[in-house]
């Protein structure tokens, strides 16, 4: 049964996807479903990114040399997860795998960035359901106008399963963790020093200044801390709920960036995430929760570095782990 229903407000203010209705607060990154085929287990959805509506975008300008703020990798993953969840509302999102981030999505003021999201099931017979998701964005001409061309920006797979309430499954965990304090060689960076780095070396503001302090770094290791915060991220939604904790993933991304800051302060280049082998999470973070961040480098070449990283709660439990996070120099 092909549901060619756009998501539209029903009298109760919910979104209508044909036979299932969704609350916009539960899917803040999906604006409309252009087409959904339950039998083939696939859907096409639409999302326009804009500074006016997406309050979080203005805070995300990781590089001073890029003119406009960017759609963050953390929110791209959230978009992927929401698309998969609409296809399988009875399942829980557990993570993503084989993610490739091919290009940045810049958001100039007054220019919305319309994007197409495609999601389909891949592989069957697993304990988990895997959905392949891709996001393509309408190109902007050199004059700053939208063209007819859509360019693929990122793709990956979302991991879901049906063990409701049981929490996520992290597998056998990451080898050689935890990162021990005696492995660290650099001095700690307190909150004041971290804020100074944000101000001097990046265009990150507010929500995206997620690092609280850095315990330090050593050969191939780094450790720090974040306090989890979520504020009102959307102009049109009061109580948006996410599928995972985007600002914890953001903190793990920034942690490996701070490795370079600590180990080689004279390095002027920046790093950008290109690939994520696999990300899994046990649960979502609570606002105000303090989380220890740690990462180990697994590979290094001329193009960049590959890492495994995790976030740990105050009980010592891993709540998010990332395997094969590949960062490239820019």
Where are these regions (language model features)?
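Acyl-thioester-processing domains in fatty-acid/polyketide/NRPS systems
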Residues: 3-330
